[in-house]
Amino acid sequence: MQPTNSFKGIVMLLLCSFIWGTAFVAQSVGADLLGPFSFNGIRSFLGAFFLVPCIAVIDRLSGKPLSFWGTDDSHKRGDLITGGLCCGVLLTIASTLQQTGIAYTSAGKAGFITALYIVIIPILGLLVKKHVTFMQWAAVAVAAAGMYFICINEGFSINKGDLIVLACAVVFAVHIMAIESFTQLVDPVRMSAIQFFVCGMLSLPVIIWAEQPELSAITAAWLPLAHAGIMSCGIAYTLQIAGQKYVNVILASILLSLESVFSVLAGWMFLGETLSMREIGGCVLVFAAILLAQMPERK
């Protein structure tokens, strides 16, 4: 992999985690106004609808004929549909498990346990015979320790909410690995759009028959919905898919876990929240893990 392309992928994933981390306030406000399926479903549709004109603009600028699929090759179109469906289903399951589990545990514990996908990914990699270097294992361990210091401020015990969120972390790990499998085969913007159409459609039955949000609640939440739909879904997740094309999955997972670091830093910078030495130490460890993950393996 060319160093220039690797750097490009790192920048994309950093931007992705930055957007996710700084979007925490908007998502919290939206969650107070709408049920989890309503908020996630509507923002998914917004993300998909935002990406459709982006696809048209990109095609026009590159001189390609306007087409949602971007190809007449049935195999490439099949890869695109399969990738979008797989990633959309996985993302919906992970988001639902996270939202369910967080009702029974603290936000800090949920954040830490979710970030354990950085540990789960290399374990799953071994199952599919992917080579993981010693430095990558070290980076994963350091990043996990950093996430613990950032997210956990009280004693650690396990309850049913923690187990649900752990299941969410496993699904997120599979989601990241699925993106790695498809990102070399398909256009990232198109796959991202399909992913969010799938997320929205899977949420729709629950929105209609269970949560039944009032129009006044949706209009009251328009700003956090727009932010989460356009920034978190439309832009950030697309950056994730595009960035993973150039970065190995271990480094990608650590870069994506910076969401928690950026969330803490954003709270300190913009909301006047206190940043403890424990949290600062955790941030330093995660950044150190990023450097470790990029070190070459000794021959």
Language-model regions: role of each:
Residues 2, 44-45, 52, 56-60, ...:
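C-terminal-most transmembrane helix of multi-pass membrane proteins
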Residues 38-49, 99-130, 168, 249-268:
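Specific alpha-helical transmembrane segments that line the substrate/conduction pathway
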Residues 37, 47-51, 121-122, 157-211:
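Transmembrane alpha-helical segments that form core, pore/gating elements
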Residues 51, 132-152, 172, 203, ...:
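Hydrophobic transmembrane alpha-helices of multi-pass small-molecule transport proteins
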Residues 1-42, 88-89, 93, 97, ...:
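Glycine-/small-residue-enriched transmembrane alpha-helix faces in small-molecule transporters
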Residues 42, 110-116, 179-200, 233-269:
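Helix-helix packing/entry segments at the starts of transmembrane helices
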Residues 21, 25, 88, 92, ...:
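Hydrophobic/small/kink-forming positions within alpha-helical transmembrane segments
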